[in-house]
């Protein structure tokens, strides 16, 4: 919960916030193994009403965390969706109780490879069990019950967060009123899997990999940095890279690259290794690649059980999760007569568009939530 007055850095900020951790006895994974105990890092913004029917769960993407809005003490930058979460914003904390949690398998406070194995007293690292998108959602469901919430007003997310939102609609059809899926898909294509495989192989090829049992003093940093560089290319569009970098020379005294785009990617890779774990990168990308609700008739059958309204947003410039994948979701929902609104935004920023400030996107989210909050259609 916020612990101070709103920060002036961003108008409408929820202010200074703290990440909390909820601990549960255990979670049985879809593969049959058990996480004991289960820890979930989370943050909340706003106030849960007496009926407990105003809660919105926001789900993060691959490298995200529970810190979606506001500022941690001493930070200069706010949470990853601060533009959209806060008083008077699209996810209005004057109306809604926003919950954001770190996925299990990650490395930002929830159970994952960095967690301590009770049998050895050491971090699990690569011995941590495989975690699926379904497992991530089942862990979130425990957190929702922890708050005494039976039905969420909405579940929202982009990219991997969109997959979690989709999984919520299928696994717990009576537990959410609205589902917002942005820049996502019902399953990864061969190309999407290929991008992730290159990143994983970069990590596995690092001399410090040591079968995933590396020390913090000798981590596979070069491999993880290369994985992040590869991934970051897919998050941007050709137009954005052309406009931002073109063929400009690198800034500063950088000898290892001849171009500005190269120095940018090197910076992204090097800064990433300071805030993310290589094992978690492998676990989370595998969860992404193994997620599948199917396509075509198979997807239509799976989505026949959903009971909520949908907002699906795609981006013309997103070549990592191209609009046709969102359209497949929409078509399957329409066959099942599920209320769905589909919008393709011509945002030049590529896949990262769902994360970036946009007045148009803010208006779309705001209008959808307001319409359904009032019992109408968007």
From Swiss-Prot:
GO terms for biological process: homoserine metabolic process; methionine biosynthetic process. It is an enzyme of class 2 (transferase). It comes from the Bacteria. Residues 54-355 form the AB hydrolase-1 domain. Its main location: cytoplasm. GO terms for molecular function: homoserine O-acetyltransferase activity. Pathway: Amino-acid biosynthesis; L-methionine biosynthesis via de novo pathway; O-acetyl-L-homoserine from L-homoserine: step 1/1. The active site is at 159 (nucleophile), 318, 351. Substrate binds at residues 228, 352. The keyword Manganese does not apply. One of its GO terms (cellular component) is cytoplasm. Keywords: Acyltransferase, Amino-acid biosynthesis, Cytoplasm, Methionine biosynthesis, Transferase. It is found in: Cytoplasm. It catalyses: L-homoserine + acetyl-CoA = O-acetyl-L-homoserine + CoA. SUPFAM superfamilies: alpha/beta-Hydrolases. Its EC number is 2.3.1.31. Belongs to the AB hydrolase superfamily. MetX family. Transfers an acetyl group from acetyl-CoA to L-homoserine, forming acetyl-L-homoserine. Homodimer. This is Homoserine O-acetyltransferase. It comes from Leptospira biflexa serovar Patoc (strain Patoc 1 / ATCC 23582 / Paris).
């Amino acid at each position: 919960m916020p612990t101070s007055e709103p920060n002036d850095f961003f108008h409408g900020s929820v202010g200074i916030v703290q990440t909390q951790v909820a601990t549960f006895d255990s979670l049985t994974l879809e593969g049959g193994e058990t996480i004991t105990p289960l820890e979930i890092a989370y943050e909340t913004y706003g106030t849960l009403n007496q009926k407990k029917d105003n809660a919105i769960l926001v789900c993060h993407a691959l490298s995200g965390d529970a810190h979606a809005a506001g500022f941690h003490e001493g930070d200069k930058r706010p949470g990853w969706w601060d533009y959209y979460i806060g008083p008077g914003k699209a996810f209005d904390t004057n109306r809604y109780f926003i919950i954001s949690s770190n996925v299990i398998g990650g490395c930002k406070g929830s159970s994952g490879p960095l967690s301590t194995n009770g049998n050895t007293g050491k971090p699990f690292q690569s011995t941590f069990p495989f975690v699926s998108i379904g497992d991530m959602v089942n862990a979130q469901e425990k957190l929702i019950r922890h708050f005494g919430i039976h039905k969420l007003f909405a579940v929202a997310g982009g990219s991997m967060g969109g997959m979690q939102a989709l999984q919520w609609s299928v696994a717990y059809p009576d537990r959410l009123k609205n589902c917002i899926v942005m820049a996502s898909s019902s399953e990864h294509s061969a190309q999407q899997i290929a991008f992730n495989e290159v990143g994983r192989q970069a990590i596995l090829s690092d001399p410090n990999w040591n079968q995933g049992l590396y020390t913090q003093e000798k981590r596979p940093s070069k491999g993880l940095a290369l994985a992040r560089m590869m991934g970051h290319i897919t998050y941007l569009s050709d137009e954005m890279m052309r406009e931002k970098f073109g063929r400009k020379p690198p800034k500063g005294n950088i000898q290892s690259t001849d171009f500005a785009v190269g120095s940018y990617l090197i910076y992204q890779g090097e800064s990433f290794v300071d805030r993310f774990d290589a094992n978690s990168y492998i676990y989370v990308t595998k969860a992404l690649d193994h997620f599948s609700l199917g396509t075509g008739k198979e997807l239509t059958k799976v989505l026949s059980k959903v009971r909520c309204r949908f907002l699906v947003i795609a981006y013309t410039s997103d070549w990592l999760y191209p609009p046709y994948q969102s359209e497949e979701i929409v078509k399957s929902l329409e066959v099942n007569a599920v209320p769905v609104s589909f919008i393709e935004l011509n945002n030049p920023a590529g896949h990262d568009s769902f994360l970036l400030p946009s007045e148009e996107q803010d208006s779309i989210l705001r209008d959808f939530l307001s319409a359904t909050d009032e019992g109408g259609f968007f």
